[in-house]
Amino acid sequence: MGCCCCLPSIPESSRTIDEHLPLSRATPSSLSNAYSSPLSPPIPLAITNINLQTSPPKLPRTQGNSSEASPGLTQVVPEKKTWHVDDLTDFELKKQYREAIDECPICLEEYEIDNPKLLTKCGHDFHLACILAWMERSEACPVCDKELVLTES
């Protein structure tokens, strides 16, 4: 057997010499008509515009239980909820957070005896070497961007 080009039913004389030329060397007239003819436009999709559909008019809303509003048009406003918050200050919360995460925010390494941590007035702690190098470039805390003041301890 063989491929479709090798079938005996197709005479070799029907093949043209253009079949063996690369497209870059072929003349434009020898290119297929599919490449030179314009493409047909795409088939349009059936689109329905949601904005064109009619909707019932919106009724005016009133708050509360006024006597002049009809019962179908009133809106009940829920009561204000209060949330219980512990009596912890921001500094105490930051202290609890620092104890939970015991690493320097600049270098992301844990604190060790060789490289101690230093606490700032804004409540953040850093390696001594890291914060001193930071203070050469900036006067703001690397975490909260407040003025960087070191504590005396």
Curated annotation (Swiss-Prot):
Name of one Pfam family that matches: zf-RING_2
Keyword Zinc-finger (UniProt): yes
Keywords linked to the UniProt accession: Cytoplasm, Metal-binding, Stress response, Transferase, Ubl conjugation pathway, Zinc, Zinc-finger
ZnF start-end (RING-type): 104-145
Disruption phenotype: No visible phenotype under normal growth conditions, but mutant seeds are insensitive to germination inhibition by abscisic acid (ABA).
Keyword flag Signal: no
GO biological-process terms attached to the record: positive regulation of abscisic acid-activated signaling pathway; positive regulation of hydrogen peroxide biosynthetic process
GO cellular component, one term: cytosol
Enzyme Commission identifier(s): 2.3.2.27
Catalytic activity: S-ubiquitinyl-[E2 ubiquitin-conjugating enzyme]-L-cysteine + [acceptor protein]-L-lysine = [E2 ubiquitin-conjugating enzyme]-L-cysteine + N(6)-ubiquitinyl-[acceptor protein]-L-lysine
Outcome of substituting H127A: Strongly reduces E3 ubiquitin-protein ligase activity
GO molecular function: ubiquitin-protein transferase activity; zinc ion binding
Triggers of expression: Induced by salt stress, cold stress, drought stress and abscisic acid (ABA).
Main location: cytoplasm
Subcellular location: Cytoplasm, Cytosol
Catalytic class of the enzyme: transferase
Domain notes: The RING-type zinc finger domain is required for E3 ligase activity.
Additional facts recorded: Plants over-expressing AIRP1 exhibit tolerance to severe drought stress.
Function: Possesses E3 ubiquitin-protein ligase activity in vitro when associated with the E2 enzyme UBC8 in vitro. Plays combinatory roles with AIRP2 in the positive regulation of the abscisic acid-mediated drought stress response.
Protein name: E3 ubiquitin-protein ligase AIRP1
Source organism per UniProt: Arabidopsis thaliana (Mouse-ear cress)
Taxonomic lineage of the native organism: Eukaryota, Viridiplantae, Streptophyta, Embryophyta, Tracheophyta
Encoding gene per record: AIRP1
